Amino acid sequence: MIPNSFPDQAEMARLTAGMLLEIEAVHFNAREPFILASGLPSPTYIDCRKLISFPRIRSTLMDFLTVTVMREAGFEAFDNIAGGETAGIPFGALVAERLALPMTYVRKKPKGYGRDAQIEGVMREGERVLLVEDLTTDGGSKLKFVEAIRKTGATCGHTAVIFSYGIFPETESSLAAEGVKLHHLCTWWDVLAEARARGSFDPETLGAVETFLNDPRAWQEAHKRD
């Protein structure tokens, strides 16, 4: 796999956004907001798990993600690829296959005891591990996985995702504070631009989504349920 034979990052972001729209992984609804795991409302929702059911798109995006990591981290930067339970497991396996590296996965909670209680597969002390997930919002769950990886004696300074919300400034800063670099293919801004170009949603909905993206905390406060 030769990184220079692929599109630049901006074009890969546009193509990724288009593929997510094509498989209807993107949902916008400002009138009846989605409730996130945090309990906060959002007019946007994305389901990257759907990608595993679309082989051509899945393969293309895994090529894109692998190339992005190689461009930004290097050709020989890792010894092990770890998928985060649950959504990151298939994508971790696909990236590991492309890089010809061992694959492991990290549990959300320990199973049993000892420093390897959250790790399935073989992860050796000193190995340089790339954590792969489907998406990130604020980076919080990634740090929990990184902590579990580091407990084994391995190192983890990089995480790769297909989709990053790209609207919460603390995402990359919180990861960076723990020595973790985030690699991603596209954000809500890329999806919004491509949705406008395709006419995927009506102008009122797209306008409401843009308002949210510009100040998500204020939008969430204004749309909180009592």
From Swiss-Prot:
Q: Does the keyword Zinc apply?
A: no
Q: Which GO terms describe its biological process?
A: 'de novo' UMP biosynthetic process; pyrimidine nucleobase biosynthetic process
EC numbers, comma separated? 2.4.2.10
The cross-references to SUPFAM superfamilies, in alphabetical order and at most eight, read: PRTase-like
Xref: Pfam families:
Pribosyltran
What cofactors does this protein use? Mg(2+)
Q: Which pathway does UniProt place it in?
A: Pyrimidine metabolism; UMP biosynthesis via de novo pathway; UMP from orotate: step 1/2
**Quaternary arrangement and interactors, per the entry?**
Homodimer.
Q: What is this protein called?
A: Orotate phosphoribosyltransferase
Organism name: Dinoroseobacter shibae (strain DSM 16493 / NCIMB 14021 / DFL 12)
